[in-house]
Amino acid sequence: GRLACCIRLLNNKIPTLEELKMPPVLTELAQKRRGLILVTGPTGSGKSTTLAAIIDYINKNRACHVITIEDPVEYKYTQEKATIHQREVGRDVDSFSNALRSALREDPDVILVGEMRDYETISLAMTAAETGHLVFGTLHTSSAAQTMDRIIDACPPHAQEQVCLLYT
């Protein structure tokens, strides 16, 4: 093989939801106290930037505890009203699921899961949302139907029916 490099340049400034021309419903979702909110789309579609804008909105408007779990950390937050702890998979933690399990012991109000790739992470994120946390996550899907299919397909057969009942 040959040596190759891929570099993604990101702006140091986190754009606001208004600057991203996001609909007002995202501001409303950022004000929720619990639930599971998924941002979906293909690689490079703006999922991380959208979530950064949402977390930054929360940071500027709400005194709360936010934990982000990312691979890699793409934006650094300056703490304002919120206390924000950022974890990077591979550096601070070994996996999304272990980081999420650990985060739940730290009494967060808001949790950002950079990618929900496997059943354990998805299950923990759903449990966190059901137990009173506001959870944001991403999936590489292009429609609501594909997102539900991806979540259900990640679950073992014994859990698929329960997930269908909870989220449809």
Can you describe what each PLM-predicted range is?
Residues 1-166:
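Short, flexible helix-loop junctions that flank or precede catalytic/ligand sites
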